[in-house]
Amino acid sequence: MIEGLVSIIMPSYNAARFIGESINSVLLQTYSNWELLIVDDCSKDNSVEVVRKFANIDKRVVLFSLEKNVGAAAARNVAIEHAQGQYIAFLDSDDVWDEYKLEKQLAFMKQYSYVFTFSNYYVMEENGKKTENIVKVPSSLSYHQYLRNTICLLYTS
């Protein structure tokens, strides 16, 4: 484990259309101590070529290519096995982050001594336009609500 490092986990399957913008949103982060671990799950489009272009420019972007299609959850697990960071963040290949996302989230976690956080996010249209629809974090969540509520597990932005 490398202290302060954020390991960003990104599964990818036929994501060539969006993955460049997603990677760019990581490259633009104001917090720069991160590694981006992208696991390609046997894409049939040119996703791998798009990722390789970024990996050749920035060594923090690391590509793993699977030999068999295993699905997003298993692809995430492959990346987690290679993660070196103190923190793990999930970002899907068709999502983007605000440039201050890591900086703000880490500051919040440190300020309140949290080991796990998630945040509000905007729903985006397929063309990349941000809608006014915001999925908000509940103000409180009991243990039983947490077990019933999958927002922590399904949404990665």
Please annotate each region the language model reported:
Residues 1-157:
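Nucleotide-sugar donor-binding/catalytic module of glycosyltransferases
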